A protein has these predicted regions:
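Small-residue-enriched alpha-helical segments and adjacent helix-cap loops
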Residues: 2-8, 28-175, 204, 302-437
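Short acidic (Asp/Glu) and glycine-rich catalytic loops that position anionic groups and cofactors
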Residues: 26-28, 106, 183-190, 218-225, ...
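Flexible helix-coil linker/hinge segments at domain or subdomain boundaries
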Residues: 93-98, 212-221, 249-266, 358-366, ...
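Short, flexible, solvent-exposed loop/turn segments with mixed acidic/basic and small polar residues
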Residues: 19-25, 57-63, 215-220, 288-293, ...
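Long hydrophobic segments that form regular secondary structure
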Residues: 282-283, 288-299, 303-330, 465-499
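Mobile "lid/hinge" segments at catalytic clefts and subdomain interfaces of large enzymes
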Residues: 138-241, 421-486
């Protein structure tokens, strides 16, 4: 049983396989997948629904802020058959946790977006193949986030390495951004590296960046081991040259091993001023939207707080097969998109019972709400984020009307997995004193922007008791976001429970 495992295996080694021990639920493990670009097939989703269903009341899944899925409630003895099951349907959980490159994100509308600049799917797939291949990193100093932008609303500056579409001498490629991250100690948006790359060079360059980080990153101070600290140490010009040197070494090494298909060509990199084609905040992607393919639509569904149960996963798989092309897309806002829906199928899809729970037309408060898992599963979290967020949002819906969506990010602790600094309103689990007692509370951050003038949210209130949070947020929504207080005689708004 799991009790026989030594501490290092239980809390570190298993994470290389994507298996996570959760002290809050001893004996029940979490498995994090890798879903490059957030793409999952109906067949894969149906298999995952069966896995979660076998966990009974302990089973659930979460859509993450990296367009990924986490499965909860598994037993250790489930793991070997699960890994075989994942492999059979083309999925993996390898290197999805601890000091490894995490799921690679891209445009969730890749290939179907009327506003698409470039299809990110093959680029993201190539990067994942390189990172998980024989030349990929195995022991980074710290976790590492990579993302590829493909549309005018691809906000990616919270990643360690981000590729934003850009032109150079009339050719479409990518400008390189580096160093973005959130943590308990420091929060930074990525900065221009001063390089432009052709689209077919991203995987080789990413390998070179990670090879250098693996060799040169800080291993003595874990709280100063993210990429931006290395950039600070070397200076931007010094870091850029070190990465180019690493790339040249990688090309020679892989050529000797006859693995050069992942290496790329450093000579293709060009100096660049960091300008790019991303110009506005991300769309929510919800509702019925026309694809660039005539006669086809995607239907964006709001999944409250990204929480799924086995029945919902199985039903989603059925809807994707019945009404779409058998493919689902996951978004960083923890929502789901059914793609390639013919116009003739839209009415039937809209009539499906699941769409009363996962609505294509959520309220402006629900549409862009994001939450980490909270203390139901995470021992770092100070509050139950998902349940609290849903309860507070439903209360606010009864009190105010909003003219537009307000992006609200909830996180349980300063590690900031819920990305509170990206929210127009960010909330972070805390403690506060009320009536002489220490109680669960939330810090409030305001002002996060993900448009052409990106900005991290700043601290507004260092601790509001959860019991007072709806009152405080109501006032903020009225004063700063144009909300109008509802007539108390108005009927209730629809609500969805989140466990």
């Amino acid at each position: 049983g799991w009790e026989s495992l030594d501490e290092a295996t239980l809390t570190i080694r298993l994470k290389w396989l994507g298996i996570f021990f959760r002290p809050v639920t001893p004996g029940r493990f979490m498995v994090r997948l890798r879903l490059p670009n957030g793409v999952i097939s109906a067949e894969q989703l149906a298999v995952l629904a069966e896995v979660v269903d076998r966990c009974g009341e302990h089973g659930s899944a979460d859509i993450t802020t990296r367009q990924n899925l986490q499965l909860r409630g598994l037993l250790l003895e489930d793991m070997a058959p699960l890994m075989a099951q994942l492999e059979r349907v083309g999925l993996t959980s390898r290197q999805s946790g601890h000091d490894n490159p995490r799921n690679i994100t891209g445009n969730p509308l890749a290939g179907i977006d009327p506003e698409e600049i470039i299809d990110t799917r093959p680029l993201v797939d190539a990067i994942q193949a390189a990172l998980l291949g024989p030349a990929g990193p195995r022991n980074l100093p710290r976790k590492f986030n990579v993302a590829v932008g493909g549309a005018p609303d691809s906000f990616l500056l919270h990643n360690d390495l981000a590729f934003l579409p850009a032109h150079h001498n009339g050719e479409l490629g990518f400008t390189v951004m580096v160093g973005g991250f959130f943590s308990a100690q420091r929060n930074e948006l990525a900065i221009p590296l001063g390089l432009w790359l052709p689209a077919d060079q991203l995987s080789g360059f990413t390998l070179a960046v990670l090879r250098h980080f693996e060799r040169a990153g800080n291993r003595q101070q874990r709280n100063k081991s993210r990429l931006m600290y290395l950039i600070d140490q070397l200076g931007l010009e010094g870091y850029r040259q070190a990465v180019l040197d690493s790339w040249t070494e990688l090309v020679a090494e892989l050529a000797a091993q006859q693995e050069s298909h992942h290496a790329g060509d450093p000579a293709t990199a060009a100096p660049h001023d960091g300008s790019h084609l991303v110009s506005r905040a991300p769309r929510d992607g919800l509702g019925v939207q026309p694809q660039k393919q005539a006669g086809l639509h995607w239907v964006g569904l709001h999944v409250p707080m990204g929480r799924l149960d086995a029945a919902a996963m199985a039903e989603l798989a059925r809807l994707v097969r019945t009404h779409g092309s058998g493919e689902l897309r996951l978004t960083e806002a923890q929502n789901a998109l059914i793609v390639n829906v013919p116009a003739a199928r839209i009415q039937a899809l809209q009539a499906e019972p699941l769409l009363q729970r996962f609505r294509p037309d959520p309220s402006p408060l629900q549409a862009e709400a994001v939450s980490c898992t909270g203390n139901a599963y995470c021992s770092f979290a100070l509050i139950p984020t998902k349940g609290t967020a849903q309860m507070v949002l439903e209360e606010l819906e009864q009190r105010v009307e909003l003219p537009h969506a307000v992006r609200m990010h909830w996180t349980g602790c300063p590690n900031a997995c819920g990305q509170p600094y990206m929210g127009q309103i960010g909330l972070m689990g805390a403690k506060a004193r009320k009536d002489g007692q220490m109680v669960e509370a939330a810090k409030i951050f305001l002002g996060g922007a993900m448009d052409a003038g990106p900005k991290l949210a700043e601290l507004h209130d260092k601790g509001v008791p959860l019991s007072d949070l709806a009152d405080v947020l109501e006032q903020l929504l009225v004063e700063r976001f144009g909300a109008r207080r509802r007539d108390p005689a108005a009927g209730p708004s629809p609500s969805v429970a989140v466990s």
